[in-house]
Amino acid sequence: PNDMYMEYHFTKTCYVKISLENDSRYSTPNYIWITMSNELIRFLKANNHTLSVTPLGISEEDLRIFKKNLYEIFEDSCSVVYIPAGRSMITLLSQQLSYIYATMDDMQKRSLDTCTKDYLERILRLKPEFSEGLQGLAYSSGRSGLSPRLVVQALDLTQKILRGTYRYSNGEEQIVLEDGKYVKINFSSSGQQECVWILNLLFYYLVQQKEILFIIEEPESHLFPESQKYITELIALVNNCGHSIVLTTHSPYVLGTLNNLLYAKTI
């Protein structure tokens, strides 16, 4: 019916309404109409020319202020970290990734969907943070007020899933084994390639103690059932530390683990 609509409220005064309307004012008929609340319209008008683009791009400070104001409008300070499916290809090309991305022109970068582009840029930006491995990040958590018990628990689960620990050394991503030897990430198993950046991002933001909404696609990819259980427990641990998680999954092992955690009242 033409009077059908959906209305999404972020706050009492900030909302977006999506409805059907046969609009013939344009050469291409538009049947989906989006209406924004007055508060949101005022914000967009006031910030229409806030971000100025220079040859070096948009100023980080301008972008930070804009995001801060935007979060205030939506009354949501939670940053979003999207972790897509098909992660192994990005991990497989890890050493070439910086070069490939640097050689892309602006139009090619814009052709990437926003979620994938954000994921790529986040990985490239955070790699150097793991120069001392997860243990190095764990050491920094000692000054952040995070419970040492939680850090040890997260490290233990990560070790069980990855069968080693991640390290970024001399421009190379590595999985360090218990005997001190390491395997380059592009020579590791498909399961390790799929899960390594889920683990890294979960642990990094756990240590940072910054409120995050994680959207994780198919965390079970290429993992044995036991590892699927462990990665679900790690996700639950991070969720219990003030973060929010959205999962997509086809795995009965993931769902079974979540059910058990719910029955045990640990999530």
Spans of model-derived segments:
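Low-complexity/IDR signal
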Residues: 64, 69-70, 89, 115, ...
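A generic structural signal for alpha->beta connector loops
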Residues: 77-79, 163, 242
